Swiss-Prot record:
Single GO term (MF): structural constituent of ribosome
Listed SUPFAM superfamilies: Translation proteins SH3-like domain
Organism: Mycobacterium tuberculosis (strain ATCC 25177 / H37Ra)
KW Ribonucleoprotein (keyword) present: yes
GO biological process, one term: translation
Entry-linked InterPro entries: KOW, Rib_uL2_dom2, Ribosomal_uL24, Ribosomal_uL24_CS, Ribosomal_uL24_KOW, Translation_prot_SH3-like_sf
Protein name, entry field: Large ribosomal subunit protein uL24
Family note: Belongs to the universal ribosomal protein uL24 family.
């Protein structure tokens, strides 16, 4: 998967189209990413009491994962781009590059 944790992405389809956010978590086995402030859902949690007597629960708003095909990585220029790879000559490792301008990400 070409999108990693910490990347800034732009949502290109769905109800949050046009929103930018940071990837909080990536799920490569499911091809999904958790983006900050995108795909917010309301989750109903059971009311529980802690040892100090505080009660928690009710309706909680949180982010839900979104499919990786619905986001594009934003490059250093602030524009969405596709991702490619090149092999670094010194280390021999793959480095992600922007297809739009050819710079490293």
């Amino acid at each position: 998967m070409k999108v990693h944790k910490g990347d800034t992405v732009l949502v290109i389809s769905g109800k949050d189209k046009g929103a930018k956010g940071k990837v909080l978590q990536a799920y490569p086995d499911r091809n999904r990413v958790l983006v900050e402030g995108v795909n917010r859902i309301k989750k109903h949690t059971a009311i529980s009491t802690t040892q100090r007597g505080a009660r928690s629960g009710g309706i909680v708003t949180q982010e839900a994962p979104i499919h990786v095909s619905n986001v594009m990585v934003v490059d250093s220029d602030g524009k969405p781009t596709r991702i490619g790879y090149r092999v670094d000559e010194e280390t021999g490792k793959r480095v992600r590059i922007s297809k739009r301008n050819g710079k490293d990400i």
